């Protein structure tokens, strides 16, 4: 889910800004796999929300953090970082795996939430799964072509659809519709029938 959440917005040459406080698997995804795909991840100390702003440039597509990072369990400043990002056209993607019952990041301004079903639902690593939730609270169109080109320019892989325009009649769901119609199609993940 974390990979899809980022890949839905960032391509080679783009970057995201991430908290340094991450689960080891996510850290390696960001430091190695995304790097190999040409997506730079800029790690910042999350105790100062301004660090996210200071690491941002014209190619920054998202901020990423964990609500209660594993193993530190320190509380991430969701509202502060979400506000910084929103003013710059950058969504905050939150991994809420450790606190699904305790915290509702969308209510604090996060735009996208991811969960590791492997950890929370399975618990022993015998199942693999992830979940992405689009909060429907981020104005992707207002973020614009320069900040969010993946959703504001024609997608040649889907008949030239401009996602923010294509889904307007059904609501602010361009982010999740693009994930379902492109990443699920291309990378072989399967949605549960239930």
Q: Where are the language model's segments positioned?
A:
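Conserved PLP-enzyme active-site core in the AAT-like
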Residues: 1-194
């Amino acid at each position: 889910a974390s990979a899809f959440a980022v890949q839905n917005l960032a391509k080679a040459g783009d970057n995201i800004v991430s908290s340094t406080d991450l689960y080891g698997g996510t850290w390696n995804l960001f430091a190695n796999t995304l790097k190999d795909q040409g997506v730079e991840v800029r790690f910042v100390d999350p105790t100062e929300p301004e660090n996210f702003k200071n690491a941002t440039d014209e190619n920054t597509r998202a901020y990423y953090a964990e609500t209660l990072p594993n193993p530190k369990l320190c509380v991430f400043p969701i509202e502060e970082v979400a506000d910084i990002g929103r003013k710059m056209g950058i969504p905050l993607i939150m991994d809420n795996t450790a606190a699904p019952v305790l915290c509702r990041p969308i209510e604090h301004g996060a735009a996208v939430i991811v969960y590791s079903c492997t950890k929370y639902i399975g618990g022993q690593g015998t199942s693999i799964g992830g979940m992405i939730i689009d909060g429907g609270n981020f104005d992707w169109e207002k973020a614009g072509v320069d900040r969010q080109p993946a959703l504001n320019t024609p997608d040649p892989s889907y008949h030239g659809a401009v996602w923010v325009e294509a889904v307007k009649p059904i609501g602010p769901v361009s982010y999740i519709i693009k994930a379902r119609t492109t990443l699920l199609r291309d990378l072989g993940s399967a949605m549960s029938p239930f």
